[in-house]
Amino acid sequence: MERLSAAPVKGQTGPERPSPFSQLVYTNNDSYVIHHGDLRKIHKAASRGQAWKLERMMKKTTMDLNIRDAKKRTALYWACANGHAEVVTLLVDRKCQLDVLDGENRTILMKALQCQREACANILIDSGADPNIVDVYGNTAVHYAVNSENLSVVAKLLSCGADIEVKNKAGHTPLLLAIRKRSEEIVEFLLTKNANANAVDKFKCVHQQLLEYKQKISKNSQNSNPEGTSEGTPDEAAPLAERTPDTAESLVERTPDE
């Protein structure tokens, strides 16, 4: 088996548990030990980008492309998490299910965006993946795209009917999340798409206040005044949930070697 992250040793203190607030939007529950028995051959081949092996397996026998591993993940999930667009195309062309949910109600599209696999995400969107499913924290695919600061995917999702006003459990619409991320281009784009400029999160932070805060940071940055970036920041502007999806390196689950 392969250990994906160091587990606490008996007698030692493990990582500090996140507060309930930090769990409202995103979690980091993807670190675990994968046993050989957890994955079938189809999952291993998909995770490694072995399209040729999958095709050979499909020719030999009738396969259930949507069969899940012990944690409810399909071959398509594994291909997207590891960025194997060729395998994603193969599975989609063979009519596998697109909107299979994992244990946290995340779609495969969300996972592709969380792992910053844009090519895989685009294939899913073009193939009709539902952009409006919410995970257990209330996030849609648009929240994930905004958090990854991927303007092109945000635009693509909206063009395919994604809801621009969904609030996650922290009270963040995609617009508020973009402001929290200081993603100026995405903020401006969402406003051109008539995102609600009066959206309020659970701390009652009015959007206009956050915009002014962002503009102050931008102005201070241009003036090369690092101390000024924190001046005039309302306490309410602190986000309810501090945790965001980790980088792709820590999110991609690796499979055991054969």
UniProtKB/Swiss-Prot annotation:
Chain intervals with Basic and acidic residues compositional bias: 243-258
Keywords noted in UniProt: ANK repeat, Repeat
Xref: PROSITE patterns: ANK_REP_REGION, ANK_REPEAT
Disordered as annotated region, ranges: 1-21, 216-258
ANK repeat extents: 71-100, 104-133, 137-166, 170-199
Pfam families: Ank, Ank_2
Entry-linked Gene3D superfamilies: Ankyrin repeat-containing domain
UniProt cross-references to SMART domains, sorted A to Z: ANK
Biased composition (Polar residues): 218-232
Protein name: Putative ankyrin repeat domain-containing protein 30B-like
Species the sequence originates in: Homo sapiens (Human)
